Each structure stands twice: as C-alpha cells, then as structure tokens.
Amino acid sequence: VGSKPRLVLLNKADSADPEVTVMWLDYYAKQGITALATDCRSGKNVSKFYGKLKELLKDDIEKWNAKGMSGRPIRIMIVGIPNVGKSSFINRLAGSRLAKVEDRPGVTRGKQWVKLDEGFELLDMPGVLWPKFEDKLVGERLAFTGAVKDDIMDMEYLACRLLEFLKENYPELIEKRYGIRTDDIEPADEETIGCVVGFELLERIGRKRGFLVSGGEINTERAAITVMDEFRNGTLGRLTLEKPKAVSYT
C-alpha cells in the first residue's frame, strides 16, 4: 500500500484471546499504526470503522472540501490473506449479503466495488498469500486457520501440530473440550514434538469421542478433521496463535 493511510483490522476478535488482542493493539499503536479489533458475527466495533477511517483521512478530506470536491466518493481497498472474514466484514458494513461468504479460502475470485455508507466505496480483493514461506511455522499457522487449502495439506499432521501448540499454550481448552489429560505426555525431543506428542493427544481425542474403525483401531483422520473444524469455528474456545514479538510483556 506504499505511503497510503492504512487501518489494520484484527477480525474475529470474539474468537481470539482477549489479553493477546490487547497486546496486538498496543503493538500497532507503538508503531504508529491505527488498528481496530472487530468481529463480524457479533458486530463488535464494526460501527467504529468509519470513524477510524475519517481520522486517518482527515487531512485529505479537508483538502477535497477546500477544492469543492466534498461530494466525491472516498475509495478504499480491503486486502488480506484468505479466510479471515473480509467478505463477512463487507457484508456487515453494507447491511446485506453483497459478498459471497464461505468458510474456505478462495471464495472471492475477482475485484468488486461495493458502495458503503458515509460516502465510501470499497474495493474487495481476493485473498492473497506469499508464494513461499521462509518460516515453516508461519505456513503451519496459516494452514491452521484455513488460509491454505486443506486439500493440499496432511490434516492429521496439521491437527497434531495444532494440538501440540494448544498443549503448550492453552492446555485447559483441550482438557475442557475433549475431557482428556495433557500434563502426562512428555516430548521425546524438539524435532518430534509435534508428531509424537500431538499424535498421542489426537489418539486420546479419537478414543474419547468413539472414533473407532473395525478392530477397535482409532480413526485418527476423523479425529483430526474434528479438531481442525472445532478450532476454526471457535468451539474450542478463545485463543490466539501468535503474540507480537517486538513488544516485551512480563
């Protein structure tokens, strides 16, 4: 976006860890970047969107008014990775289902202009991802959210990695949702932590849920899909995958 004014939306805030959301808002404020935590399902803070934009564009709007251009539409663009709720956010703003919404990446195929209230016109863009992830962990966490298409991912491995993250950061969510212990599993070493520990948790969940196949073996594929679905739809509880690194919190 170059030097153009930017408003960062922290969407799906009602599914995020509220304490970490505060950290992110503080982080962006210290960088001089305006940020707003929103949620499209509840409508939280969506009404503040126009006010934040007008604050950012105050100087530009004053210049346009001075030139007698007060009636011109203010054009803005929304960009982001796939599956973060861009279309749902637009629908909230527009008051109707103008943008197609599905819980999978790649639903918005082309650019489209949407007329909003208060003189704004918004350009909706398809979600975009980096062609390559230098940090494997970044790619994994994006895959957790569904930003990467599931049909190119190993869902069992993905669920194991997610469960390992949850064990280290939100063990109470696993225990509450699935009724299993997490504190009696020790990792073999750092290289296998996401496979060995995560797979043990996945098997426990499958056994607890009764996901069994012939011979009494655990259907770990079904367990993996269940874990990923319940993480993505918020059933597991409120959690955040990453904290800001540039700010120290004690």
Language-model-derived ranges and their functions:
Residues 1-7, 13, 19, 34, ...:
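Helix-rich effector regions associated with P-loop NTPase G domains
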Residues 7-8, 77:
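A structural signal for isolated positions on well-ordered beta-strands in alpha/beta enzyme cores
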Residues 16-75:
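Canonical P-loop GTPase G-domain recognition
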Residues 24-27, 95, 138-142:
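Glycine-rich, phosphate-binding/catalytic loops in enzymes
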Residues 60-64, 91, 97-103, 169-174:
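Short, structured loop/turn "capping" segments at alpha-beta junctions
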Residues 71-73, 96, 111:
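Short coil/loop residues immediately preceding or within conserved phosphate-binding loops
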Residues 76-95:
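Glycine-rich phosphate-binding P-loop
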